[in-house]
Swiss-Prot record:
Residues 49-61, 81-97, 179-192, 200-214 have a biased composition (Basic and acidic residues). It comes from Danio rerio (Zebrafish). It comes from the Eukaryota. InterPro entries: DUF4660 (IPR029089). Keywords: Phosphoprotein. Residues 1-66, 81-214 are annotated as: Disordered. The lineage of its organism: Eukaryota, Metazoa, Chordata, Craniata, Vertebrata. This is UPF0690 protein C1orf52 homolog. Pfam families: DUF4660 (PF15559). Residues 152-165 have a biased composition (Acidic residues). Belongs to the UPF0690 family.
Length: 214
């Protein structure tokens, strides 16, 4: 830079300093005067505000300024639809066939002809009822009569006569009669014991009398 440019820059900053000094002096001079004049007015205003009642909510909200850009002047309501930001619509996806190594399906289907079955006939080597349990003609039939555990000849020999049957019935009925309850058994025992005790008492008295006579 040349000497002239340096001097111009210095003069510029020096002039700015002079302006700032003059403004600060004016503020310093006006400061105490303004405070002195506003000092008596402030307590009066504060007293007036304290004496006044608080405004109602309706009045308070009416006095509050509302931004005009949020309202529609015709309907006096917020037009949210116009202000909503929507995402850009995606283009419709195109269907693409997957690449695979599978064999494509045939264009036409052909049904295979039915294979020839074996000629109809009975296989004598297999009993179908035993294998598949389908109760065919060759399946074993269930015995529906009374069970016979012995041959017919032995059963006839072991059958008792009619007299034996009657005697066995009588013996069974007698056994049923002889069945006693626990209380009956105890009573019978007490009776037997009392009889024996009386007999012993009599025999003891006889023995004592014999001794006295001797």
């Amino acid at each position: 830079m040349s000497d002239e440019e340096k001097s111009e820059t210095r003069n510029f900053f020096m002039g700015y300093d002079d302006l700032s000094d003059s403004s600060s002096d004016s503020e310093s001079r006006s400061g105490p005067e303004a405070t002195a004049s506003s000092a008596p007015a402030e307590p009066q205003q504060s007293r007036k505000r304290a004496a006044e009642p608080l405004p109602r909510p309706d009045e308070l909200f009416r006095s509050v300024s509302k931004p005009a850009f949020l309202y529609n002047p015709l309907n006096k309501a917020i037009d949210w639809d116009s202000r909503a930001v929507r995402a850009p619509e995606e283009p419709p996806k195109e269907f693409k066939v997957w690449k695979s190594s599978a064999v494509p399906p045939p264009q036409s289907y052909v049904t295979e002809e039915n294979k020839k079955k074996a000629p109809a006939g009975m296989d004598m080597a297999i009993k179908w009822s035993n294998v598949y349990e389908d109760n065919g003609d060759d399946a074993p039939q269930a015995h529906r009569g009374p069970a016979h555990f012995l041959p017919e000849e032995e059963e006839e020999e072991q059958q008792p006569d009619s007299d034996d049957d009657s005697s066995s019935k009588l013996s069974k009925s007698a056994k049923k009669r002889r069945v006693e309850t626990f209380q009956q058994k105890e009573k019978r025992k007490r009776d037997i014991g009392q009889a024996t005790s009386d007999k012993n008492f009599v025999e003891e008295e006889k023995r004592i009398l014999r001794q006295c006579l001797d």
